[in-house]
C-alpha cells in the first residue's frame, strides 16, 4: 500500500471535559453510580465532544452497499439482485433505516460502491462503481489494491462530509448480499478463530447452509494464506467494498473528532479492521448492540466493547445503532438537565 492516511493521528479525548463531567455526575440529585452505564456514557461523550454537557442533536447515517462474488458458492438465502433493490428502498423511504432516520431526524446518505447492476442509476444514491461487486474470494482475491484504496477512501470521504455538516454522531450501515460471509472470513483471520464459530444464518440460512458457509470460508482461507498481522491483505482478499468503506469511515471519524456508534456483526468486523490499522481510533467507537450472529459476542469481547442493547437483531443497515441513539440522547439529557444537590436544596449524603 502506497498511501497510509489511516495511520494519521486520531483526535485526543478532552480529559478536562471528562473530569468536569465526572464531577458534575457526583453532584446530581441521585445516589452516585445509580444510573449505571448511562453515567459512564455521558462522561465518555463529554471527553469526545470536549464539553462538560454533551448533546447528540446532529446524527449522520451512511449506508455503504456492495455485492459479493462469493455468492456464487451458494452461501446466501437471497439473490444478489436484492442489493440494488434495497438501494431503491433506502432512498424511497421504505427500509427500516429510512424509517429510523426520519424518527431520529438524522441525515441518511447512501453510497453504492459496486453492485452487480452496473447500469443502476438512482437519484439520491452516490454511485461510485468500484466494480460489479467483489470477485469470488473462494477462488481469487476479492479486491484489487486500487479497489481497496478506493473503498477505504470512500468511507473517509463520508466521514469528512459528516464532520463538515456538524455531525456529533456517525452511524455506518451496510447492505450487500453475502456480506456476513465476508465478515466472518475476515473475523476468522483477525481473531484466529475457526470459521465454524463465527458463521451464522445471515439473511436466513438453515443449519446445513451455515455449515456450507463455514466450509467455503475455511477453503478460502487456506487458498489465501492470510495472517492476522496483515489486516489490509485480509480485507483485500476476503473482505467487501462496504466493509472496507466502513473501516475507512471509522478511521476518518476518529481523525476528524466525530463519535462513531457501531452497528452489528459486519460493522463490528469493520471496526476491528480499523482498530488493527490504527489502535488510536478505538476511543472514538461506541458499540450499539450485541446481535444474533454467533460471532458477534466474540468480536465484542476482542474489542473490549460493552454493547448498549441486546435485542436479537440481525438486519444490518445500521438499524441497531439507530435504535440505540435515543438511549445516548437520554444519557446526555439526564447529565445536562438534572439538578445538582445545591440547586434542588437536597441533602447530598445519607443522614
UniProtKB/Swiss-Prot annotation:
Top-level division of the source organism's lineage: Bacteria
EC number(s) on file: 2.4.2.21
Coiled-coil annotated residue ranges, if any: none
InterPro entries: Nict_dMeBzImd_PRibTrfase, Nict_dMeBzImd_PRibTrfase_bact, Nict_dMeBzImd_PRibTrfase_N, Nict_dMeBzImd_PRibTrfase_sf
Name of protein: Nicotinate-nucleotide--dimethylbenzimidazole phosphoribosyltransferase
Record-linked Gene3D superfamilies: 1.10.1610.10, 3.40.50.10210
GO biological process: cobalamin biosynthetic process
Alphabetized CDD domains for the sequence: DMB-PRT_CobT
Family per similarity comment: Belongs to the CobT family.
GO MF: nicotinate-nucleotide-dimethylbenzimidazole phosphoribosyltransferase activity
Reactions the enzyme catalyzes: 5,6-dimethylbenzimidazole + nicotinate beta-D-ribonucleotide = alpha-ribazole 5'-phosphate + nicotinate + H(+)
